[in-house]
Curated annotation (Swiss-Prot):
Main localization category: cytoplasm
Taxonomic classification: Bacteria, Pseudomonadati, Pseudomonadota, Gammaproteobacteria, Enterobacterales
UniProt keyword annotations, A-Z: Cytoplasm, Methyltransferase, S-adenosyl-L-methionine, Transferase
Family annotation (InterPro entries): PCMT (IPR000682), SAM-dependent_MTases_sf (IPR029063)
Protein name listed in UniProt: Protein-L-isoaspartate O-methyltransferase
UniProt catalytic activity: [protein]-L-isoaspartate + S-adenosyl-L-methionine = [protein]-L-isoaspartate alpha-methyl ester + S-adenosyl-L-homocysteine
Length: 208
């Protein structure tokens, strides 16, 4: 039953323009129902965002795929994720690259995500409880940075931690939000607006 729902979801994603086969294989390999509350597991393969507690959500599969595709990952890409959340996006990234660094400001979510990833034998992820606005400078620079919550403006620390040729994908804005794709070229940043989106806000600071 789960496999049938997964295949339906993958077909929907293809129809929405997701064509990267390596990405689609990663999506197929990650059991989304393991990242949501058991009471919502029947909705795990619907193409919609779902609550995960602490005022946070697990992103819509299309948005996970779209943002990941924009990163243009190769197996050796150095990746930073801001907002571990449930760990679902983290797991997708872990199937695509050799190592993922992920920062989560809410300690409980970080712990749960770390446990889920371990249960799925995804050991190529380093998680950290910290302020996502600050990134993870000691592990940078990064070829790709993905932010799963929306700051009102692009955090300077994340731009500084982006390597030459690197790509930063994030939602930006408060009431009206847009998905931005930022590429660093010759120490200049080219910002492209991709589409209108709706994410939870990227809050500064840490929460125990």
């Amino acid at each position: 039953m789960v496999n049938k729902r997964m295949q339906t979801l993958l077909m929907q994603l293809r129809q929405q323009g997701i064509q990267d086969e390596r990405l689609l294989q990663a999506l197929e390999a990650v059991p989304r129902e393991r990242f949501v509350d058991e009471a919502l597991s029947h909705k795990a393969y619907e193409n919609t965002a779902l609550p995960i507690g602490s005022g946070q959500t697990i992103s819509q599969p299309y948005m996970v795929a779209r943002m990941t595709e924009l990163l243009q990952l190769t197996p050796t890409s150095r990746v930073l994720e801001i907002g571990t959340g449930s760990g679902y996006q983290t797991a997708i990234l872990a199937h695509l690259v050799e190592h993922v660094c992920s920062v989560e400001r809410i300690k409980g979510l970080q712990w749960q995500a770390k446990r889920r990833l371990k249960q799925l034998d995804l050991h190529n992820v380093s998680t950290r409880h910290g302020d996502g606005w600050l990134g993870w400078a000691s592990r940078g620079p990064f070829d790709a940075i993905i932010v799963t919550a929306a700051p009102p403006e692009i955090p300077n620390a994340l731009l500084e931690q982006l390597d030459e040729g690197g790509i930063l994908v994030l939602p930006v804005g408060e009431q009206a939000q847009t998905l931005k794709c930022v590429q660093r070229r010759n120490n200049e940043f080219k910002v492209e607006t991709v589409e209108a989106v709706r994410f939870v806000p990227l809050v500064k600071g840490e929460l125990a």
